Amino acid sequence: MAKNLNSVSFTVLLLVLLVASTEILKSDAACFTFLGECGPEPFTGSNADCLACCVALYKSPPVCAGRVEGVPAHCHCYKS
């Protein structure tokens, strides 16, 4: 029994290391650092319009998301 438990523990450890090293579970949660605002106030477009505005203003590598937030609506740009 202890031998089986040891083998299972070792296998789980290898799987955790594999997932961590290959960043399989990388998510959008890493995109949370506020970069700035874009566009007019209030922003009347969608999240896709906001992202296009952010990419045009700040370029693509730093920008990972553009979201319409707040009242009145603002276009907020985020980087990872």
From Swiss-Prot:
A single Gene Ontology CC term: extracellular region
Compartments it resides in: Secreted
Domain of life: Eukaryota
This protein's record includes keyword Acyltransferase: no
Family the UniProt entry places it in: Belongs to the DEFL family.
Alphabetized UniProt keyword annotations: Antimicrobial, Disulfide bond, Fungicide, Plant defense, Secreted, Signal
Disulfide bonding pattern of the chain: 38-64, 50-75, 54-77
GO biological process per UniProt: defense response to fungus; killing of cells of another organism
Signal peptide boundaries: 1-29
Protein name according to UniProt: Defensin-like protein 206
